[in-house]
Protein backbone atom coordinates (compact mmCIF):
# COMPACT_ATOMS: atom_id res chain seq x y z
CA UNK A 1 0.00 0.00 0.00
CA UNK A 2 1.25 3.49 -0.89
CA UNK A 3 0.12 7.01 -0.01
CA UNK A 4 -1.16 8.69 -3.16
CA UNK A 5 -2.64 12.01 -2.09
CA UNK A 6 -2.97 14.34 0.91
CA UNK A 7 -5.75 16.94 0.97
CA UNK A 8 -6.40 19.61 3.61
CA UNK A 9 -9.68 21.35 4.42
CA UNK A 10 -9.87 24.48 6.56
CA UNK A 11 -13.27 24.50 8.25
CA UNK A 12 -15.45 26.51 10.62
CA UNK A 13 -15.29 27.25 13.43
CA UNK A 14 -11.45 27.13 13.61
CA UNK A 15 -10.51 23.60 12.53
CA UNK A 16 -8.61 21.88 9.76
CA UNK A 17 -9.06 18.30 8.57
CA UNK A 18 -6.72 16.33 6.34
CA UNK A 19 -7.39 13.27 4.23
CA UNK A 20 -4.70 10.76 3.29
CA UNK A 21 -5.59 8.56 0.32
CA UNK A 22 -3.89 5.30 -0.68
CA UNK A 23 -3.58 3.24 -3.85
CA UNK A 24 -5.81 0.55 -2.30
CA UNK A 25 -8.69 2.94 -1.64
CA UNK A 26 -8.26 3.11 2.14
CA UNK A 27 -8.57 6.66 3.45
CA UNK A 28 -7.43 8.13 6.77
CA UNK A 29 -8.49 11.38 8.42
CA UNK A 30 -6.58 13.66 10.79
CA UNK A 31 -6.97 17.09 12.38
CA UNK A 32 -3.79 19.20 12.20
CA UNK A 33 -4.31 22.75 13.37
CA UNK A 34 -3.11 25.56 15.59
CA UNK A 35 -6.05 27.77 16.39
CA UNK A 36 -5.39 31.05 14.59
CA UNK A 37 -2.55 29.61 12.49
CA UNK A 38 -4.42 27.12 10.29
CA UNK A 39 -2.86 28.35 7.04
CA UNK A 40 0.63 28.06 8.48
CA UNK A 41 0.04 24.49 9.65
CA UNK A 42 -1.54 23.73 6.27
CA UNK A 43 1.67 24.83 4.53
CA UNK A 44 3.70 22.56 6.82
CA UNK A 45 1.43 19.59 6.06
CA UNK A 46 1.99 20.04 2.33
CA UNK A 47 5.74 20.32 2.81
CA UNK A 48 5.64 16.93 4.55
CA UNK A 49 3.38 15.60 1.78
CA UNK A 50 6.23 15.93 -0.71
CA UNK A 51 8.04 13.21 1.24
CA UNK A 52 5.02 11.12 2.22
CA UNK A 53 3.55 10.55 -1.25
CA UNK A 54 4.58 7.08 -2.40
CA UNK A 55 5.45 5.85 1.10
CA UNK A 56 3.90 2.90 2.96
CA UNK A 57 1.35 4.30 5.47
CA UNK A 58 1.81 1.25 7.71
CA UNK A 59 5.27 2.44 8.75
CA UNK A 60 3.90 5.00 11.19
CA UNK A 61 6.91 5.06 13.49
CA UNK A 62 9.42 5.54 10.69
CA UNK A 63 7.36 8.23 8.98
CA UNK A 64 6.97 10.04 12.31
CA UNK A 65 10.72 9.96 12.95
CA UNK A 66 11.49 11.23 9.45
CA UNK A 67 9.04 14.12 9.82
CA UNK A 68 10.48 15.02 13.22
CA UNK A 69 14.21 14.34 12.77
CA UNK A 70 15.05 14.64 9.07
CA UNK A 71 15.00 18.44 9.20
CA UNK A 72 17.68 20.26 11.18
CA UNK A 73 15.03 22.46 12.85
CA UNK A 74 12.27 20.65 14.69
CA UNK A 75 9.54 20.90 17.29
CA UNK A 76 7.31 23.87 18.01
CA UNK A 77 3.57 24.33 17.57
CA UNK A 78 3.41 24.50 13.76
CA UNK A 79 5.54 21.50 12.86
CA UNK A 80 4.24 19.30 15.69
CA UNK A 81 0.63 20.11 14.79
CA UNK A 82 1.26 19.17 11.16
CA UNK A 83 2.86 15.91 12.28
CA UNK A 84 -0.04 15.32 14.68
CA UNK A 85 -2.74 15.41 12.02
CA UNK A 86 -0.75 13.23 9.64
CA UNK A 87 -0.06 10.75 12.43
CA UNK A 88 -3.78 10.55 13.33
CA UNK A 89 -4.65 9.79 9.71
CA UNK A 90 -1.97 7.08 9.48
CA UNK A 91 -3.40 5.36 12.57
CA UNK A 92 -6.87 5.67 11.04
CA UNK A 93 -5.62 3.86 7.92
CA UNK A 94 -3.88 1.14 9.93
CA UNK A 95 -7.00 0.43 11.96
CA UNK A 96 -9.16 0.25 8.85
CA UNK A 97 -6.72 -2.12 7.14
CA UNK A 98 -6.61 -4.40 10.19
CA UNK A 99 -10.35 -3.96 10.90
CA UNK A 100 -9.76 -2.84 14.50
CA UNK A 101 -10.14 0.38 16.50
CA UNK A 102 -6.89 2.14 17.31
CA UNK A 103 -7.14 1.33 21.02
CA UNK A 104 -7.15 -2.36 20.11
CA UNK A 105 -3.90 -1.93 18.17
CA UNK A 106 -2.34 -0.32 21.26
CA UNK A 107 -2.96 -3.26 23.58
CA UNK A 108 -6.65 -3.00 24.36
CA UNK A 109 -8.79 -1.26 26.93
CA UNK A 110 -7.74 -0.31 30.44
CA UNK A 111 -11.22 1.07 31.25
CA UNK A 112 -14.80 0.84 30.06
CA UNK A 113 -15.64 4.55 30.09
CA UNK A 114 -14.02 7.97 30.57
CA UNK A 115 -15.48 11.04 32.25
CA UNK A 116 -16.09 13.99 29.91
CA UNK A 117 -16.07 17.60 30.96
CA UNK A 118 -17.53 20.60 29.22
CA UNK A 119 -16.39 24.18 28.77
CA UNK A 120 -18.67 26.87 30.17
CA UNK A 121 -18.36 30.37 28.71
CA UNK A 122 -19.55 33.69 30.07
CA UNK A 123 -17.91 36.59 31.84
CA UNK A 124 -20.57 37.13 34.52
CA UNK A 125 -21.41 34.66 37.31
CA UNK A 126 -25.09 34.52 36.26
CA UNK A 127 -24.09 33.57 32.70
CA UNK A 128 -21.79 30.81 33.92
CA UNK A 129 -24.42 29.44 36.30
CA UNK A 130 -27.00 29.45 33.50
CA UNK A 131 -24.56 27.62 31.22
CA UNK A 132 -23.90 24.97 33.85
CA UNK A 133 -27.63 24.45 34.36
CA UNK A 134 -28.14 23.83 30.64
CA UNK A 135 -25.22 21.42 30.40
CA UNK A 136 -26.36 19.51 33.45
CA UNK A 137 -29.60 18.96 31.57
CA UNK A 138 -27.76 16.91 28.95
CA UNK A 139 -25.76 14.87 31.44
CA UNK A 140 -22.61 16.82 32.35
CA UNK A 141 -21.52 17.20 35.96
CA UNK A 142 -17.90 18.26 35.38
CA UNK A 143 -16.93 21.59 33.84
CA UNK A 144 -14.12 23.99 33.03
CA UNK A 145 -14.36 27.77 32.98
CA UNK A 146 -12.07 30.75 32.66
CA UNK A 147 -10.48 31.53 36.00
CA UNK A 148 -10.16 35.24 35.31
CA UNK A 149 -10.10 37.93 32.66
CA UNK A 150 -6.89 39.79 31.75
CA UNK A 151 -4.78 40.57 34.79
CA UNK A 152 -1.80 42.83 35.27
CA UNK A 153 1.58 41.61 36.46
CA UNK A 154 0.61 43.15 39.80
CA UNK A 155 -3.12 43.83 39.86
CA UNK A 156 -5.55 45.25 42.39
CA UNK A 157 -7.87 43.58 44.86
CA UNK A 158 -10.91 44.30 42.65
CA UNK A 159 -9.54 42.03 39.92
CA UNK A 160 -8.90 39.28 42.46
CA UNK A 161 -12.33 39.71 44.03
CA UNK A 162 -14.03 39.49 40.62
CA UNK A 163 -12.38 36.14 39.87
CA UNK A 164 -13.11 34.74 43.32
CA UNK A 165 -16.71 35.99 43.31
CA UNK A 166 -17.58 33.97 40.20
CA UNK A 167 -16.21 30.78 41.72
CA UNK A 168 -17.89 31.46 45.08
CA UNK A 169 -21.29 31.89 43.43
CA UNK A 170 -20.90 28.68 41.43
CA UNK A 171 -20.02 26.68 44.53
CA UNK A 172 -22.88 28.29 46.45
CA UNK A 173 -25.35 27.50 43.64
CA UNK A 174 -24.36 23.86 43.13
CA UNK A 175 -22.49 22.76 46.24
CA UNK A 176 -20.72 19.45 45.69
CA UNK A 177 -23.16 18.33 42.98
CA UNK A 178 -20.67 19.42 40.31
CA UNK A 179 -16.92 19.61 39.83
CA UNK A 180 -15.13 22.34 37.92
CA UNK A 181 -11.63 23.25 36.89
CA UNK A 182 -10.39 26.81 36.44
CA UNK A 183 -8.36 27.76 33.37
CA UNK A 184 -6.07 30.74 33.96
CA UNK A 185 -5.00 30.48 30.29
CA UNK A 186 -1.53 31.72 31.16
CA UNK A 187 -3.05 35.18 31.73
CA UNK A 188 -1.65 35.54 35.21
CA UNK A 189 1.85 36.44 36.35
CA UNK A 190 3.54 34.30 38.97
CA UNK A 191 3.01 36.88 41.77
CA UNK A 192 -0.72 37.16 41.03
CA UNK A 193 -1.09 33.40 40.55
CA UNK A 194 0.06 32.95 44.14
CA UNK A 195 -2.59 35.39 45.34
CA UNK A 196 -5.41 33.90 43.26
CA UNK A 197 -4.68 30.29 44.13
CA UNK A 198 -4.69 31.09 47.85
CA UNK A 199 -8.03 32.93 47.56
CA UNK A 200 -9.62 30.15 45.47
CA UNK A 201 -8.59 27.22 47.62
CA UNK A 202 -11.70 27.28 49.92
CA UNK A 203 -13.92 26.62 46.88
CA UNK A 204 -12.13 23.35 46.03
CA UNK A 205 -11.77 23.57 42.24
CA UNK A 206 -10.93 20.27 40.59
CA UNK A 207 -7.75 21.75 39.14
CA UNK A 208 -6.15 25.03 38.12
CA UNK A 209 -4.97 25.03 34.52
CA UNK A 210 -2.02 27.04 33.18
CA UNK A 211 -1.72 29.31 36.23
CA UNK A 212 1.30 30.73 34.41
CA UNK A 213 2.54 30.33 30.85
CA UNK A 214 4.51 27.26 29.84
CA UNK A 215 7.50 29.57 29.38
CA UNK A 216 7.35 30.14 33.15
CA UNK A 217 7.14 26.43 33.98
CA UNK A 218 9.74 26.80 36.72
CA UNK A 219 6.90 28.25 38.81
CA UNK A 220 4.74 25.11 38.64
CA UNK A 221 6.48 23.36 41.56
CA UNK A 222 6.61 26.60 43.54
CA UNK A 223 2.87 27.19 43.10
CA UNK A 224 2.06 23.54 43.79
CA UNK A 225 3.95 23.75 47.08
CA UNK A 226 1.51 26.35 48.41
CA UNK A 227 -1.78 24.61 47.55
CA UNK A 228 -3.74 21.38 47.70
CA UNK A 229 -5.37 22.11 44.33
CA UNK A 230 -3.84 20.06 41.48
CA UNK A 231 -1.99 22.16 38.92
CA UNK A 232 -2.67 21.24 35.27
CA UNK A 233 -0.76 22.25 32.13
CA UNK A 234 0.46 20.97 28.80
CA UNK A 235 -1.64 22.34 25.95
CA UNK A 236 1.28 24.57 24.90
CA UNK A 237 3.95 21.89 25.12
CA UNK A 238 4.61 20.04 21.91
CA UNK A 239 6.82 16.99 22.44
CA UNK A 240 7.90 14.47 25.06
CA UNK A 241 11.12 16.46 25.39
CA UNK A 242 9.25 19.51 26.68
CA UNK A 243 7.11 17.36 28.97
CA UNK A 244 10.25 15.62 30.25
CA UNK A 245 11.47 18.86 31.81
CA UNK A 246 8.24 19.71 33.63
CA UNK A 247 7.77 16.16 34.87
CA UNK A 248 11.29 16.08 36.21
CA UNK A 249 10.83 19.47 37.92
CA UNK A 250 7.58 18.35 39.59
CA UNK A 251 4.55 20.40 40.51
CA UNK A 252 2.04 19.28 37.91
CA UNK A 253 -0.75 16.97 39.05
CA UNK A 254 -2.43 16.73 35.64
CA UNK A 255 -0.78 16.65 32.22
CA UNK A 256 -2.78 18.00 29.25
CA UNK A 257 -1.10 17.19 25.94
CA UNK A 258 -3.12 18.10 22.85
CA UNK A 259 -3.44 15.26 20.34
CA UNK A 260 -3.58 17.79 17.48
CA UNK A 261 -0.61 19.85 18.69
CA UNK A 262 1.85 17.45 20.34
CA UNK A 263 2.76 15.02 17.58
CA UNK A 264 -0.46 13.00 17.46
CA UNK A 265 -1.24 9.56 18.83
CA UNK A 266 2.30 8.24 18.49
CA UNK A 267 3.87 10.99 20.57
CA UNK A 268 1.07 11.47 23.09
CA UNK A 269 1.03 7.77 23.99
CA UNK A 270 4.67 8.17 24.99
CA UNK A 271 3.87 11.34 26.93
CA UNK A 272 1.06 9.51 28.74
CA UNK A 273 3.47 6.75 29.75
CA UNK A 274 5.99 9.29 31.02
CA UNK A 275 3.30 10.94 33.11
CA UNK A 276 2.28 7.61 34.63
CA UNK A 277 5.89 6.97 35.65
CA UNK A 278 5.77 10.25 37.62
CA UNK A 279 2.32 9.46 39.11
CA UNK A 280 0.80 12.37 37.17
CA UNK A 281 -2.75 12.19 35.81
CA UNK A 282 -3.58 12.56 32.12
CA UNK A 283 -6.39 14.75 30.76
CA UNK A 284 -5.84 15.44 27.05
CA UNK A 285 -6.56 18.98 25.90
CA UNK A 286 -9.27 19.09 23.22
CA UNK A 287 -11.25 22.25 22.41
CA UNK A 288 -11.20 21.18 18.74
CA UNK A 289 -13.18 18.97 16.38
CA UNK A 290 -14.31 15.34 16.19
CA UNK A 291 -11.14 13.80 14.77
CA UNK A 292 -9.03 15.37 17.52
CA UNK A 293 -11.54 14.13 20.10
CA UNK A 294 -11.48 10.61 18.67
CA UNK A 295 -7.68 10.56 18.84
CA UNK A 296 -7.85 11.68 22.49
CA UNK A 297 -10.34 8.96 23.36
CA UNK A 298 -8.12 6.23 21.96
CA UNK A 299 -5.29 7.44 24.20
CA UNK A 300 -7.67 7.70 27.18
CA UNK A 301 -8.76 4.11 26.80
CA UNK A 302 -5.22 2.69 26.77
CA UNK A 303 -3.70 4.95 29.46
CA UNK A 304 -4.30 3.97 33.07
CA UNK A 305 -3.61 7.50 34.35
CA UNK A 306 -6.26 9.19 32.14
CA UNK A 307 -8.85 10.82 34.41
CA UNK A 308 -11.18 12.88 32.22
CA UNK A 309 -11.56 14.18 28.68
CA UNK A 310 -12.19 17.71 27.47
CA UNK A 311 -14.54 18.14 24.51
CA UNK A 312 -15.89 21.16 22.65
CA UNK A 313 -19.64 20.56 22.48
CA UNK A 314 -21.26 23.98 22.92
CA UNK A 315 -17.97 25.80 23.49
CA UNK A 316 -18.23 29.53 22.82
CA UNK A 317 -15.69 29.32 19.98
CA UNK A 318 -17.96 27.07 17.90
CA UNK A 319 -19.45 29.58 15.49
CA UNK A 320 -20.40 28.10 12.12
CA UNK A 321 -20.12 24.44 13.10
CA UNK A 322 -20.62 22.25 16.15
CA UNK A 323 -18.54 19.31 17.35
CA UNK A 324 -20.37 16.58 15.41
CA UNK A 325 -21.57 18.54 12.37
CA UNK A 326 -19.07 16.78 10.08
CA UNK A 327 -19.68 13.31 11.55
CA UNK A 328 -22.12 10.74 10.18
CA UNK A 329 -21.92 8.29 13.12
CA UNK A 330 -22.92 10.82 15.79
CA UNK A 331 -24.42 8.08 17.97
CA UNK A 332 -20.95 6.64 18.61
CA UNK A 333 -20.04 9.86 20.44
CA UNK A 334 -23.10 9.87 22.68
CA UNK A 335 -22.47 10.03 26.41
CA UNK A 336 -24.00 8.03 29.22
CA UNK A 337 -24.07 9.79 32.58
CA UNK A 338 -21.34 12.17 31.46
CA UNK A 339 -19.03 9.40 30.23
CA UNK A 340 -17.73 8.50 26.77
CA UNK A 341 -17.61 4.84 25.77
CA UNK A 342 -14.85 3.41 23.53
CA UNK A 343 -15.23 4.03 19.81
CA UNK A 344 -15.61 0.61 18.22
CA UNK A 345 -15.43 1.19 14.47
CA UNK A 346 -12.10 0.43 12.73
CA UNK A 347 -9.40 3.09 12.84
CA UNK A 348 -10.23 6.28 14.68
CA UNK A 349 -13.91 5.37 14.49
CA UNK A 350 -15.08 8.61 12.86
CA UNK A 351 -17.24 8.42 9.74
CA UNK A 352 -16.60 11.82 8.15
CA UNK A 353 -19.28 13.51 6.05
CA UNK A 354 -16.90 14.38 3.25
CA UNK A 355 -19.46 16.19 1.12
CA UNK A 356 -20.22 18.57 3.99
CA UNK A 357 -16.50 19.04 4.67
CA UNK A 358 -15.87 20.01 1.05
CA UNK A 359 -18.84 22.37 0.95
CA UNK A 360 -18.04 24.27 4.16
CA UNK A 361 -14.33 24.42 3.39
CA UNK A 362 -15.15 26.75 0.50
CA UNK A 363 -16.07 29.54 2.91
CA UNK A 364 -14.04 28.73 6.01
CA UNK A 365 -13.20 31.77 8.15
CA UNK A 366 -9.66 32.66 9.19
CA UNK A 367 -10.20 32.53 12.94
CA UNK A 368 -7.88 34.45 15.25
CA UNK A 369 -8.01 35.02 18.96
CA UNK A 370 -8.91 38.52 20.16
CA UNK A 371 -6.26 41.09 20.98
CA UNK A 372 -6.57 42.20 24.59
CA UNK A 373 -4.97 45.24 26.16
CA UNK A 374 -4.62 46.38 29.73
CA UNK A 375 -6.04 49.71 30.88
CA UNK A 376 -2.64 51.31 30.28
CA UNK A 377 -2.61 50.20 26.64
CA UNK A 378 -0.06 47.39 26.96
CA UNK A 379 -0.80 44.01 25.41
CA UNK A 380 -2.49 41.49 27.71
CA UNK A 381 -2.34 37.71 27.56
CA UNK A 382 -5.49 36.23 26.06
Curated annotation (Swiss-Prot):
Active site: 185 (proton donor), 285 (proton acceptor)
EC number: 4.2.1.6
Cofactor field: Mg(2+)
Reaction it catalyzes: D-galactonate = 2-dehydro-3-deoxy-D-galactonate + H2O
Positions of the record's site feature: Transition state stabilizer: 310
Signal peptide: none
UniProt site positions, description: Increases basicity of active site His: 258
GO molecular function annotation: galactonate dehydratase activity; magnesium ion binding
Residues the record lists as binding Mg(2+): 183, 209, 235
Gene3D superfamilies reported for this sequence: Enolase-like C-terminal domain (3.20.20.120), Enolase-like, N-terminal domain (3.30.390.10)
Biological process, per Gene Ontology: amino acid catabolic process; D-galactonate catabolic process
Disulphide-bonded residues: none
Miscellaneous comment as given in the Swiss-Prot or TrEMBL entry: Reaction proceeds via an anti dehydration.
Function of the molecule: Catalyzes the dehydration of D-galactonate to 2-keto-3-deoxy-D-galactonate.
Family to which this protein belongs: Belongs to the mandelate racemase/muconate lactonizing enzyme family. GalD subfamily.
Name by which UniProt lists this protein: D-galactonate dehydratase
Taxonomic path: Bacteria, Pseudomonadati, Pseudomonadota, Gammaproteobacteria, Enterobacterales
Amino acid sequence: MKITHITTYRLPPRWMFLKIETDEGVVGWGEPVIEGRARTVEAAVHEFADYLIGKDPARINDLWQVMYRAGFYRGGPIMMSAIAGIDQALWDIKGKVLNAPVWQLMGGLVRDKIKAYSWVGGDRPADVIDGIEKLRGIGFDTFKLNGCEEMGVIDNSRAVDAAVNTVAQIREAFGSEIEFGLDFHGRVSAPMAKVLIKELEPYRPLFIEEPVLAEQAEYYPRLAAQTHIPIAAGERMFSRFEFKRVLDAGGLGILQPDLSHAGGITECYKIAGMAEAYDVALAPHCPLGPIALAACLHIDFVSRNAVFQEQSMGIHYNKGAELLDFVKNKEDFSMDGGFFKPLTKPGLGVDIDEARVIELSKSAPDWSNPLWRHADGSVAEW
